[in-house]
């Protein structure tokens, strides 16, 4: 009984902490990823254009920078500008899940947190990227994360719509997606 109460308390905490995040019943969707993915072409700076809201990204001018480390892993540096003008950042590492699907990565930001999926569903490497992540919770429901990224702070609306259509066609709800403010943003390190 105590274990059940602890589990229910933890779930209630998850729901309370995840306001705005996309919780759904059932297991995670399994969308196809970018074919013939080339991580070397993916490296560099990406600007967040839209996302399914997350509890861990609340600022504006959100940027991600990917670089190859000596150990073969990918260094991930995510940065955002807070309302008070300070830069919030987190650094992590991404690694391929398996070599047959190099667009399926796992990213880890802290030694005490589990790795999270980071799947590149679509990219042309020079303009846009569509990233999806999903975490299944006790086999009852899942939480979705999705990001539309661009090499520049803006992306044509027709490109954004096309990327959202990829998500929708794979049963990933885009109704909660929000635009990331990239107006008058500095280039973060």
From Swiss-Prot:
Disulfide bonds join 28-134, 61-185. Residues 1-20 form the signal peptide. N-glycosylated. N-glycan heterogeneity at Asn-65: Hex5HexNAc4 (major) and Hex6HexNAc5 (minor); at Asn-98: Hex5HexNAc4 (minor), dHex1Hex5HexNAc4 (major), dHex1Hex6HexNAc5 (minor) and dHex1Hex7HexNAc6 (minor). Expressed in liver, intestine, pancreas, kidney, placenta, adrenal, spleen, fetal brain tissue and tears. Keywords: Disulfide bond, Glycoprotein, Lipid-binding, Pyrrolidone carboxylic acid, Secreted, Signal, Transport. GO terms for cellular component: cytoplasm; cytosolic ribosome; dendrite; endoplasmic reticulum; extracellular exosome; extracellular region; extracellular space; neuronal cell body. Glycans are attached at residues 65, 98. GO terms for biological process: angiogenesis; brain development; glucose metabolic process; lipid metabolic process; negative regulation of cytokine production involved in inflammatory response; negative regulation of focal adhesion assembly; negative regulation of lipoprotein lipid oxidation; negative regulation of monocyte chemotactic protein-1 production. The modification Pyrrolidone carboxylic acid is found at residue 21. It comes from the Eukaryota. PROSITE patterns: LIPOCALIN (PS00213). It is found in: Secreted. One of its GO terms (molecular function) is cholesterol binding. Gene3D superfamilies: 2.40.128.20. Belongs to the calycin superfamily. Lipocalin family. APOD is primarily localized in HDL (60-65%), with most of the remainder in VHDL and only trace amounts in VLDL and LDL. Homodimer. In plasma, also exists as a disulfide-linked heterodimer with APOA2. PANTHER family: APOLIPOPROTEIN D (PTHR10612:SF34). APOD occurs in the macromolecular complex with lecithin-cholesterol acyltransferase. It is probably involved in the transport and binding of bilin. Appears to be able to transport a variety of ligands in a number of different contexts. This is Apolipoprotein D. The gene is APOD.
């Amino acid at each position: 009984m105590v274990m059940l109460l602890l589990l229910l308390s933890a779930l209630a905490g998850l729901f309370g902490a995840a306001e705005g995040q996309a919780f759904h019943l059932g297991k995670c969707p399994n969308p196809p990823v970018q074919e013939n993915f080339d991580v070397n072409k993916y490296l560099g700076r990406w600007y967040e254009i839209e996302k399914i809201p997350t509890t861990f990204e609340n600022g504006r001018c959100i940027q991600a920078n990917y670089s190859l480390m000596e150990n073969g892993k990918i260094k991930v540096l995510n940065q955002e500008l807070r309302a008070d003008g300070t830069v919030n950042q987190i650094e992590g590492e991404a690694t391929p899940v398996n070599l047959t699907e190099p667009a399926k990565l796992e990213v880890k930001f802290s030694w005490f947190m589990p790795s999270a999926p980071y799947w590149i569903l679509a990219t042309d490497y020079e303009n846009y990227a569509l990233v999806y992540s999903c975490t299944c919770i006790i086999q009852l429901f899942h939480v979705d994360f999705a990001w539309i990224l661009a090499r520049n702070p803006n992306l044509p609306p027709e490109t954004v719509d096309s990327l959202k259509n990829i998500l929708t066609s794979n049963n990933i709800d885009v109704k909660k997606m929000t635009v990331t403010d990239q107006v008058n943003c500095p280039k973060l390190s």
